[in-house]
Amino acid sequence: MTILNHTLGFPRVGLRRELKKAQESYWAGNSTREELLAVGRELRARHWDQQKQAGIDLLPVGDFAWYDHVLTTSLLLGNVPARHQNKDGSVDIDTLFRIGRGRAPTGEPAAAAEMTKWFNTNYHYMVPEFVKGQQFKLTWTQLLDEVDEALALGHKVKPVLLGPVTWLWLGKVKGEQFDRLSLLNDILPVYQQVLAELAKRGIEWVQIDEPALVLELPQAWLDAYKPAYDALQGQVKLLLTTYFEGVTPNLDTITALPVQGLHVDLVHGKDDVAELHKRLPSDWLLSAGLINGRNVWRADLTEKYAQIKDIVGKRDLWVASSCSLLHSPIDLSVETRLDAEVKSWFAFALQKCHELALLRDALNSGDTAALAEWSAPIQARRHSTRVHNPAVEKRLAAITAQDSQRANVYEVRAEAQRARFKLPAWPTTTIGSFPQTTEIRTLRLDFKKGNLDANNYRTGIAEHIKQAIVEQERLGLDVLVHGEAERNDMVEYFGEHLDGFVFTQNGWVQSYGSRCVKPPIVIGDISRPAPITVEWAKYAQSLTDKPVKGMLTGPVTILCWSFPREDVSRETIAKQIALALRDEVADLEAAGIGIIQIDEPALREGLPLRRSDWDAYLQWGVEAFRINAAVAKDDTQIHTHMCYCEFNDIMDSIAALDADVITIETSRSDMELLESFEEFDYPNEIGPGVYDIHSPNVPSVEWIEALLKKAAKRIPAERLWVNPDCGLKTRGWPETRAALANMVQAAQNLRRG
């Protein structure tokens, strides 16, 4: 039984973000559709060749997407919302872009589809929309075309297809409500047609992704798998593919399916290999997801070998990445600024392919010398002073319950804060950032490249902060911000100023569409060598008599939007960040900053996939926030901000944060999100966002007043703040001024009654 290797998918964007540049050029009308398609062909050919050269046996085809793979599947099935359809009923790449972005070079603009997180990753997918009575048919042949492309290049191909049950699970019903699972029988004929076409092309194995099988699914959804896969069997061999968690809780459902193989994530799941081997049908292939597709760390291949060696020769076996390598940067070799020691600890997508080749060869031959050589830097890292800081570890171990408690309860603090700030009813503020103009971005870039000295850079930033204060005073806002001109990204900025993080030059990963992010990497214990935000906050406060908020990104968000260490728990990392930022709160307070905002937009999105694991996560997530904030005195007002999400199932935890004021995104839900706070009888102050900053549209005074009156029916007016939904970084100054002027006017009208 020869062991093969494969990946579940490969990054799409290109080493230099070629796909992003081609997409945005096409959207702007600066290049043709054919030029865009040519970039896609070139990237696919390059990525297949790179994987093959790195030693991958079976190449994934169908993992490439022009915007998002869930959206690609929707088009494959003919699932195009009516507002995005071409008049002649055809489907083309602009149809896809209209669904993803709301507009494209051709066709009428229409509201984009909803976007949300892909399971518990930082990748986003476009949510399929379902309406009663809709029809499905094969309308978008991208998968088949790309299989033809790869076969023509002589590759050994393994098509990748998102499975029918997971695709339905990820979608939402629009309009008249019905059970979306009832659509399953309507989409199966399209899947049958696709599998038949693949069989005609001589395809042996198809990777059919059903990550929903790692969730705690309702019984009706689990029951749907058997009839679905009964309908799909027989044309090609199916590798049922799961990831992001283990499958043991749903293994009875899985083993009843007529498939020929199962892929399991042996990195994030707690599945026992021996138990899997015992319970899987003996003629099934097991694809062992041993190499972490979601992180950047070199694998301990001697450990991975030991994990799987006992079943070698006992069943058909492949070794693989735990999930698609989409979530990893492409190539470590182009990182020239990382020092040799730190660089030796990492493996990006291409290096992970090499790891799979080494592992396959060792399992086939029994010779593990190459594995030991590869794993040597991991042993060295365990003892590196870059990783371990005894002072941080000692401080973390000394945390007591008192460290996460404010001195007094909210009611006492609120009285002290009212006496200090004397704010009017319906106080107005913004969430933190102001427009990042071309001038600001150029200033930062010139400084980063060494084209501008520190003095001139600081003078430039100070001028932009001064402008932000002048603008806010002119508008009549009550609580001001400094505008964050010095910050490129709310996580990267803090990572750059904390020990324990490193940054890459080209470590880009796709977030959605053409948006890529370059997450910081946590390599060791985290500490704050010097104050981070104090100087600019103090300067901004010196320009005005009104309170200026200090602005921090919270510990859970910094954790969730970084590549974490694997040698300590996420809880440990979050609490180390919390302790570092606790010192920042104390220093801001000492500098005269009386209102400090600690943003936690990622608190909810960091939830584990299984609800049974939520309590433990929320307990340490809340504790980390409180450690960060609890050093503040009674008359220092702590704010937090959370982006658009469902709050009702975590209201206990939101209240437990004990922030004096929480600002939330609510305008898109027409204040309906406040229902959770009303039902819970949330005791502290709330700033429900009164307009959507993602749109350039300027809300009218009447619109904002109406929303605030609606909010006051749910939350007592004396506990309401008036603010936009989110930061204003991506907006231009003209619409920002106009929208904020109307917001301030609406608040003033309500004060007059």
Swiss-Prot record:
Binding sites annotated in the UniProt record for L-homocysteine: I431, G432, S433, E484, D599
GO biological process: homocysteine metabolic process; methionine biosynthetic process; methylation; tetrahydrofolate interconversion
Active site: H694
Cofactor note: Binds 1 zinc ion per subunit.
Superkingdom of source: Bacteria
Residues that hold Zn(2+) according to the record: H641, C643, E665, C726
One family name in Pfam for this protein: Meth_synt_1
Residue positions binding L-methionine: I431, G432, S433, E484, D599
Pathway(s) the chain acts in: Amino-acid biosynthesis; L-methionine biosynthesis via de novo pathway; L-methionine from L-homocysteine (MetE route): step 1/1
InterPro entries reported in the protein's UniProt record: Cbl-indep_Met_Synth_N (IPR013215), Cobalamin-indep_Met_synthase (IPR006276), Met_Synth_C/arc (IPR002629), UROD/MetE-like_sf (IPR038071)
Catalytic activity: 5-methyltetrahydropteroyltri-L-glutamate + L-homocysteine = tetrahydropteroyltri-L-glutamate + L-methionine
Additional free-text comment from the UniProt record: Has an absolute requirement for a polyglutamylated folate as substrate. Its activity depends on phosphate anions and divalent cations.
Protein family membership: Belongs to the vitamin-B12 independent methionine synthase family.
Protein name: 5-methyltetrahydropteroyltriglutamate--homocysteine methyltransferase
Lineage, uppermost ranks: Bacteria, Pseudomonadati, Pseudomonadota, Gammaproteobacteria, Enterobacterales
